[in-house]
Regions:
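Beta-rich, blade/repeat-based domains predominating
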Residues: 67-78, 124-136, 170-185, 228-245, ...
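A short beta-strand motif characteristic of beta-propeller blades
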Residues: 59-64, 117-121, 165-169, 221-227, ...
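Short, solvent-exposed loop/turn segments at conserved positions within beta-propeller repeat blades
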Residues: 41-42, 93-100, 145-148, 198-206, ...
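Short loop/turn segments immediately following beta-strands, especially the blade-tip
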Residues: 50-55, 107-113, 154-160, 212-217, ...
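Asp-box/WD-like beta-propeller blade repeats and closely related beta-sheet repeat scaffolds
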Residues: 116-180
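N-terminal secretory signal peptides and thylakoid transit peptides that target proteins
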Residues: 1-18
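Short loop/turn segments immediately following the C-termini of beta-strands
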Residues: 43, 87-89, 145, 193-194, ...
């Protein structure tokens, strides 16, 4: 009899296995067809777009409605399924009952990229914030922020989400924001951001929670938390595709940290610190470092800078100022150190997620909400939407076009690309 592991590994192996060059989802190596599908949400609606990498153009195709507001998604290694987490109690999307939170499988048409519901959604206990799969796509890992937690679900032989893998005692930290399995599939890292302090509440410490990982089980937890996690608010990480280097965006300090990997695990020492902002001494409003991606060729690193704080102007709330940009770093191929070489505005506000196509020639940034900005003495609205960029041989970005999207009181929260 064929075992579950053998069956799933065989199906995954029948397609091009993904490289590990993305923090949000593994776009993988370019497919034989060269086709790429992009998926982006507005609230509970997840829309499929065709992607023309050569022209950096997107064409809207079809929309599937999930049980709640989309929070995150991650593709199966075969590129034929997409696993989506959703919630009815999330920023920009609050619906009754607020206790509805789900993990849903979608089937991807390998010829067109069209998506459809696959099986019955699995109910989750609280709002999920991040989802990923292990390297052979045998398990789905879900991170929850409040209360912080991580759960692991088996992938059934029909590719629907299966039973939960029961864990031992885990310290999930404070405000878990991402869960990733390391490239060797032997460890898992839970990124816990903590919370910034306020005049009435002290800072909650952040940490990287590193586990041994085997067949869905998380064990032997070790916490990486410089200075006890104070002044350390990690948000997202990504791995270099071929070297033992890990990059972590530090949201609350607007930094990019580099960690060396040893025996598949990150060493606790910070190898390199880099700024994310073009003007780190000119903070006009709250800045937050965001998503981080290593280019598929391993030579460049990309990170998001986000700002959306508003102030009253003529009776309207308008953008207070700040950097909404992608920072590009050149990676020293001997040491792993990233050096900033470009900061480019994304043409909209709050680029929560961005993604690089599998060929490494195109980057797309997603922006959550419409925001008013001053235009001289007037006020105009900058809509939510998508911006596309061409990636040069030198790693630098060139803005190509933007797509305004009416979120109708909801929010865009996630987007990603999958090769077909």
């Amino acid at each position: 009899m064929v075992s579950r592991r053998t069956f799933l590994s065989g199906v995954a192996g029948s397609a091009v296995m993904p490289t590990l060059s993305f923090a949000q989802s593994p776009a993988g190596a370019p497919s034989a067809s060269g086709k790429v599908a992009l998926y982006a949400n507005v609230g509970a609606d997840l829309t499929h777009y065709d992607v023309d990498v050569a022209t950096a153009e997107l064409t809207k195709r079809q929309t599937v409605t999930l049980p709640g507001g989309v929070q995150y998604a991650w593709p199966h290694a075969s590129h034929r399924y997409l696993y989506v987490i959703s919630s009815n109690n999330a920023p920009g999307y609050v619906r009754e009952p607020k206790t509805d939170h789900h993990l849903t499988a979608l089937a991807i048409d390998p010829a067109t990229g069209a998506i459809k519901m696959h099986g019955t959604p699995v109910r989750l206990p609280t709002r999920p914030l991040h989802v990923s799969l292990d390297i052979p796509s045998e398990h789905i890992l879900v991170a929850f922020n409040n209360p912080a937690a991580v759960r692991v679900y088996r992938v059934n032989t029909d590719f629907t989400p299966g039973e939960e893998v029961q864990q031992g005692t885990i310290d999930p930290g404070i405000f878990a924001h991402q869960i990733r399995v390391t490239p060797d599939n032997r460890h898992a890292i839970l990124v816990t951001r903590g919370n910034e302090g306020t005049p009435t509440k002290p800072e909650d410490p952040g940490a990287l929670k590193v586990f041994d990982y085997r067949d869905g089980l998380l064990t032997n937890e070790v916490s990486i938390a410089p200075d006890g996690g104070k002044g350390f608010g990690p948000r997202h990480l990504d791995f270099h595709p071929t070297k033992p280097w890990m990059y972590v965006s530090i949201e609350t300090q607007n930094k990019m940290y580099t960690y060396m990997m040893e025996n598949g695990r990150p060493k606790p020492e910070i190898a390199f610190r880099a700024e994310t902002l073009a003007e780190p001494t000119n903070i006009r409003a709250r800045q937050a470092a965001g998503t981080v991606h290593v280019h598929p060729n391993g030579r460049f690193l990309y990170g998001a800078n986000r700002a959306e704080e508003t102030v009253d102007y003529q009776g309207k709330q308008v953008f207070k100022g700040g950097e909404n940009s992608i920072v590009v770093y050149a990676i020293n191929q001997s040491t792993g150190e990233p050096t900033p070489i470009q900061h480019i505005e994304t043409q909209k506000l709050h680029p929560r997620t961005f993604h690089i196509d599998p060929s490494g020639r195109m980057l797309v940034a997603e922006h959550n909400l419409p925001v008013n900005v001053r235009d001289g003495d007037a006020v105009k609205e900058v809509p939510a939407g998508l911006s596309t960029f061409r990636i040069g041989d030198d790693g630098k970005l060139t803005f190509v076009r933007k797509y305004d999207i009416d979120v109708a009181g909801s929010t865009m929260f996630w987007m990603g690309m999958v090769p077909l």
